[in-house]
């Protein structure tokens, strides 16, 4: 399973960074390409904050916090037993997404976003991986944790 987790993390980081590179090299900041007019666009945007732009320009805080959370995730990878593979997959998605956005913050001080559904803040592949990982973790906690003897 370790190899699968490595692939999830690596694939998340690579897809995230390549997609951001393509957007940054082929579009100007603010450009928007309609994929489905008024529903889904590729829009080149930068976010110096967290989700929804909160705490903008707190780059050092985000870098330090992300590194600390990554260390916690590494600890959890080693601490969780084989029976918690679904939790490890959730953590791998979050880990890959966090590293993808961390690379941006270290390199530029902001995160490149481009998926634009017009009714929601613009986001990227790293954000999608983090949200998917958190969603899997919430599902596990709500519906599966009793089967594993958690929270007894």
Swiss-Prot record:
Give the protein family. Answer: Belongs to the peptidase A8 family.
Catalyzed reaction equations: Release of signal peptides from bacterial membrane prolipoproteins. Hydrolyzes -Xaa-Yaa-Zaa-|-(S,diacylglyceryl)Cys-, in which Xaa is hydrophobic (preferably Leu), and Yaa (Ala or Ser) and Zaa (Gly or Ala) have small, neutral side chains
State a single Gene Ontology molecular function.
aspartic-type endopeptidase activity
Pathway given for this chain reads: Protein modification; lipoprotein biosynthesis (signal peptide cleavage)
Which Gene Ontology CC terms are recorded?
A: plasma membrane
Protein topology in the membrane: Multi-pass membrane protein
The gene for this chain is lspA
- NCBIfam families, per database record: lspA
Name used for this protein in its record: Lipoprotein signal peptidase
Q: From what superkingdom does this record's organism come?
A: Bacteria
Question: What's a GO biological-process term for it?
Answer: proteolysis
Under Pfam families, the record lists: Peptidase_A8
Localization, UniProt:
Cell membrane
Q: Which InterPro entries match?
A: Peptidase_A8 (IPR001872)
User: Any idea of its EC number?
Assistant: 3.4.23.36
Q: Indicate the transmembrane segments per the record.
A: 3-23, 57-77, 83-103, 122-142
Q: Which organism is it from?
A: Natranaerobius thermophilus (strain ATCC BAA-1301 / DSM 18059 / JW/NM-WN-LF)
| Keyword annotations | Aspartyl protease, Cell membrane, Hydrolase, Membrane, Protease, Transmembrane, Transmembrane helix
Annotated HAMAP family: LspA
């Amino acid at each position: 399973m370790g190899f699968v987790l490595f692939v999830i993390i690596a694939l998340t980081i690579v897809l995230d960074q390549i997609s951001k590179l393509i957007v940054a090299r082929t579009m100007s900041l603010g450009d928007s390409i309609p994929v489905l007019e008024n529903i889904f666009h590729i829009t080149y945007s930068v976010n110096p904050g967290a989700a929804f732009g909160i705490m903008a320009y707190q780059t050092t805080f985000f870098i330090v916090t992300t590194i600390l959370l990554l260390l916690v995730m590494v600890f959890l990878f080693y601490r969780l037993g084989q029976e918690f593979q679904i939790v490890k997959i959730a953590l791998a998605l979050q880990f890959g997404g966090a590293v993808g956005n961390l690379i941006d913050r270290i390199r530029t001080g902001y995160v490149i976003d481009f998926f634009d559904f017009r009714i929601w803040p613009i986001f990227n592949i790293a954000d999608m991986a983090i949200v998917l990982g958190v969603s899997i973790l919430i599902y596990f906690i709500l519906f599966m944790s009793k089967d594993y003897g958690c929270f007894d």
